[in-house]
Amino acid sequence: MNPIHARFSSVEALRHSNVDIQAIKSEGQLEVNGKRYEIRAAADGSIAVLRPDQQSKADKFFKGAAHLIGGQSQRAQIAQVLNEKAAAVPRLDRMLGRRFDLEKGGSSAVGAAIKAADSRLTSKQTFASFQQWAEKAEALGRYRNRYLHDLQEGHARHNAYECGRVKNITWKRYRLSITRKTLSYAPQIHDDREEEELDLGRYIAEDRNARTGFFRMVPKDQRAPETNSGRLTIGVEPKYGAQLALAMATLMDKHKSVTQGKVVGPAKYGQQTDSAILYINGDLAKAVKLGEKLKKLSGIPPEGFVEHTPLSMQSTGLGLSYAESVEGQPSSHGQARTHVIMDALKGQGPMENRLKMALAERGYDPENPALRARN
């Protein structure tokens, strides 16, 4: 059986993800809420969803696919979500006025059109997740900064962590991964202390916060954030946390554009919306390149990366999400976007319009909350 690369904690997580529909159709399977489903093309051209034990009934299922899409079972809901996402993807033959075979290549204009279409779709998905966050806050009457930030932090994949002997071995590897002469390591909870004031070895060995709090990874050749800066969030299965931390340290040694990194303690991996972050000087294109280099350095198999995009961030690939900083706004991604939502909640009218106005006023792209405004 081939490994499953597309995993989602619930139908809602699938609905609000930036999943690649074509990739799922090619792979032919996905996992939702711990259950595996087969993906097939129905006779009417729609996407059909099957449980593995239904393979013998495939022909009959395909004939009734349209009926099943409207059902209420988890399988039917998955089919509905996938078909809605497929319908939202611009059809290249309609957009370009002719059919185009990607394997045979084409003009640079066609390639640019494809990239532009993908970019617009991703922006819409990013904005949709941002609007959902704001509307949920408004419905719950949560207008305070802390409550809004809690909603964002709670948007997590909630991976189950290993236990017993495996957990202890992983923790030992995790500690070994954060020892490098070119980097300084310090718990975020002690940002107010100088490096020489903290006994890191003792903290890791004795303080219970070491297993759940964030560790900063800062190059000793201090690298200040520039005007064009952002963050790349990396999501992996908890058992690969130490392997990822080591790759992050190696990437920082090789690329001066990475100003620092941050990893959460192993007991908290997958329990919040982001568990590993790289802060970079550059733009979206730079983040994409660094993300791919990090994947290669890590040696983590494709199935080790999780499909999860934090609210108001832009997916740049499986397990990778990106968002930019704006000068004068909070450096924390969650806090910065929380302030935008707080502004929008004070206004009147459609939430979409309120959010776009609030984003523009704070220097963000009104069409994509992950990016800063371009002049």
Swiss-Prot record:
Domain of life, source organism:
Bacteria
Keyword Ion transport listed: no
Alphabetized Pfam families for the sequence: HopA1
A single GO BP term for this record reads: symbiont-mediated perturbation of host programmed cell death
Could you tell me the keywords of this UniProt record? Answer: Hypersensitive response elicitation
Q: Function of this protein?
A: Unknown. May serve a regulatory function.
Put simply, this protein is called Protein HrmA
Q: Which organism is it from?
A: Pseudomonas syringae pv. syringae
What is the primary gene name for this protein?
hrmA
